Amino acid sequence: VEDTRQRALKTIGMLRDNGVQHVRTHIDVTDPSLTALEAMLRVKKEAAHLIDLQIVAFPQEGIESFPGGRELMTRAIEMGADVVGGIPHYENTRDKGVSSLVFLMDLAERHGCLVDVHCDETDDPQSRFLEVLA
């Protein structure tokens, strides 16, 4: 936690020195310990006077295809992440991709969060999750 915290604070200092006032950062919440999220939530509080830091709970390994993915996403939002993230084309099947979108939209609605979905970032023409999201 401390190493991540120190590196993030150093980066925020550099960003602020160059006029950056807002950052949206994606934190991988498929780490069951949620160590990076814990560190960045501390950084957000410590650096609030310097920069507006928005934290995305991002399921880098998927929500439905990763063991405990739904629980980790829910826990991340309950801990204080600002935005619900998603990456449906990383799920093992199309059905799981669709299910992950339904889950993340419901989670965001229940907690009043914004949504940040990395959608169809692939060369596969059959990856059409944007249609589901819309």
Regions found by a protein language model. Give the residues of each.
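Alpha-helical scaffold segments that flank or form the walls of functional sites
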Residues: 1-26, 34-46, 72-78
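A general secondary-structure boundary signal
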Residues: 42, 52-58
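A structural signal for isolated positions on well-ordered beta-strands in alpha/beta enzyme cores
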Residues: 24, 54-56, 116
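Active-site mouth loops of central-metabolism enzymes
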Residues: 1-6, 56-68, 88-95
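Conserved short loop/turn motifs at secondary-structure junctions
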Residues: 26-31, 59-62, 91, 121-122
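Histidine/acidic residue-rich metal-binding segments in metalloenzymes
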Residues: 35-49, 66-134
